[in-house]
Amino acid sequence: MLNNRGSGESKIRDALKSGEGGMFVLFDVDRFKSINDNFGHNVGDKVLVAIGAAVRKTFRENDIILRLGGDEFAAFTPGIYSMEAGKPVVKRLISSIESMNVPELSGMIVNVSVGVAFYQPDDNYSFEELYKHADSCTYESKKTKGSFATFYQNAADF
């Protein structure tokens, strides 16, 4: 199920408060404004619906998936604590979105910028900090061409 921002963030906060660790994935569509400008908002809406379907296929049933607004989405995957465990999930996400079929796009591939941060069960910071870490990674990913993911590394992890 795709949660709205309020519902999804509340569920993630509850998971963090209960000591549940996991991977927080934040992503948005590259050049979404260009899709709306060149193909129309109706096609942009179809892209968002297709992304919602692709995201639901990528993540597990117990994962918390949310649309934050506009072209920004997020997911929290309980029990995935490392880059090694998270990379295959992120690769599936990118591949699933790139292979979406939106006929009105005439074969154009939709790319996403992805930021990933991990929350360990013994971490003691807020959802806002977790979001900030993933958001800074999404910003770094936007600097590349095409779909790209950046993983947050906490200095304390080294």
For each predicted feature, which ranges?
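Inter-domain helical "communication" segments and dimerization helices
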Residues: 84-86, 96, 100-104, 145-158
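Conserved long alpha-helical elements within nucleotide-processing catalytic cores of c-di-GMP signaling
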Residues: 1-23, 30-60, 66-70, 74-75, ...
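Catalytic core regions of nucleotide second-messenger enzymes
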Residues: 67, 97-113, 142
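A structural signal for short, well-ordered beta-strand segments
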Residues: 24, 73, 112-116
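Residue-level recognition of strand-loop junctions within catalytic nucleotide-signaling folds
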Residues: 37, 76-81, 98, 119-120
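Catalytic-core segments of nucleotide cyclases and related cyclic-nucleotide turnover enzymes
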Residues: 91, 119-146, 156-157
